[in-house]
Amino acid sequence: MSAVKAVQAGQRPSAMPSSNGRCRSKYKRELLERAAADGLTQEAVEALRSSDGWQRWLRVRCQLATHGLHNQFLVAHQRPGARHVASQQGWRSLGYEVRSDEAPIRVWAHVPASKSAVCDWRRAGSPPEEKPEGDLRLVPVFDQDQVSPLGEVPKPVQKKHPRSGSSEANKLIRLLGQLIKFASEIGVSVNFEPIAGVVRGYHEPGTGEIVIDASPDFPPAARAARLIYELANVLIDEDPGRRRLKLCNGEREVVARSVAWCVGACAGRGYAEAIVVPTQWAADSGSVAFRYAALVDRVAGRLEGALLSGLEGEQE
């Protein structure tokens, strides 16, 4: 089994702990405090102010969407081509070893309290709220291209996929169906009809209707991409955190296109064009760029969640 196959099989160790809601909230607050005081993390956040840095983060997010935002920024800053990351111990559990000359990627992770600290707490008879919970630290992880197999690894069986035009057409039909279903769930109707002029789609806030161009020269793949973009704009307006951001036309366009970029990649329909951040965006502080990225992550996550369940069968 290759490193990619091992990770895709659901065997990737996570750098982030699973916990209840109260612990997650505490963990988030602690992460924000630690990240604000850490030079490497701040460099990674500041990189979002440039078009190149923003694009690097979008590519990393498409591969590591389940990792927290701060860790996505760190990976994009240190190794933007990373696709699957795990600790050295994690890779060994999968049958791989990290090569000796490889530099680690530093990411935030919760390190559990030592056994001795927990034993001391028990012996002292201290109350539950004083139980040692561990610490938040920058820990080393490695990408899949930094490891080699331990011993002989069997070659994965290559599945034969039928080459037929109908397969691609069926995927597009399924994608459009999932998008239309999601739109109806948030109170938005979708209509396809010819549109005169250069505009290929639009959203009418007063009626809650999205209209997508159905002209013969606007193929189904382009219609799906435009529908994702229009839905992104709807969700941007609905997002509670959006009110804390002053989105001018340039900033809003970048956020919407970034969402469409991420969701398109999730649906297997990547976008080739680069996304250029506005001049004013680049002049703002890294904390503002962080809030833009968080908005993209939230909105894209909603659309990706709606699509994944319906598209998993098509991607197998």
Cite the ranges covered by each PLM segment:
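N-terminal accessory/interface modules of nucleic-acid-binding and processing proteins
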Residues: M1-E316
